[in-house]
Amino acid sequence: MAARAERSVKRLATTWVATARCLLPQPNTDPLDPGEAQLWGRHHIAHLMVIFTDTLQTVTTPTTIRPMTLARVIDERRKATNTLAAIGHEVIADDTASRLASQAQRLLDNVESVLLATPGPPATVDSLVGPVRVTDQLRATLLAMAAMGLHDGIDIPSGAIIESCRTLSAVLDETHGGRTIELRVPPACAVQLAAIGSGPNHHRGTPPNVAETAPVTFLQLATGFSHWPEMRSAGRVQASGSHVDDVAGVFPVVDMAGVFRDIFADD
């Protein structure tokens, strides 16, 4: 069991590192050309550095305190947005984007060496927001990086999109689980949800209300980068059942679009 858990952490960590590298300019790109400087602005790079530093400190700080649930981890990190943004502003100081990018690359190398070491990080660690499972720290920060990719139009690994969808569906199951609507996101996940207000409570088999969408669309909906009515109108959601549009009420699961609009406003 321990070996299987360690392999699972390694797979997640590998996806985490690959995603982080996609969000940084290529090493030794100095100075950044105008297009790169616009894409990889100082606040973008500084926020990544905050994520890297937070993760490095967290995965090297074991704890025996009972970890919080994934949904609470996501919510507590949302509440800490202003704190993280303030740290990012301190990181920027008077540095250029090029110098920040070089620092971020070195920091990411350090994170990678810790995450992929054998043995790996402890199972439960002390984070910025309290005791968490190391996998939940990686999932929460991977979700933040996937949302950064959406915000900036940067392609990220498909594994990161799939993992982020699974994180979001787990949060939905914890916060809005029920037996009225089945939301399918093949091949990533499926989750059964309660209706908003009154609705049938199905006890066996597939609920009578079914919605299905692609992972990228689900990620956009769940992080606030798109909205249910427009995705329905565009044919990017297939739905059936009289209560299926109640799904709109659970989005966004976490409003990363609003967070990044504020953090990156000066880039």
PLM region descriptions:
Residues 47-50, 54, 141-151, 171, ...:
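Short, hydrophobic/amphipathic alpha-helical patches that form generic packing surfaces
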Residues 68-72, 166-175, 244-250:
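Short, mixed-charge aromatic SLiMs
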Residues 64-76, 130, 134, 188-189, ...:
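Charge-rich, acidic-biased intrinsically disordered regions
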Residues 53-109:
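Short, helix-capping/interhelical loops that line the mouth of catalytic, cofactor-
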Residues 177-219:
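Glycine/small-residue-rich hydrophobic helix-like segments
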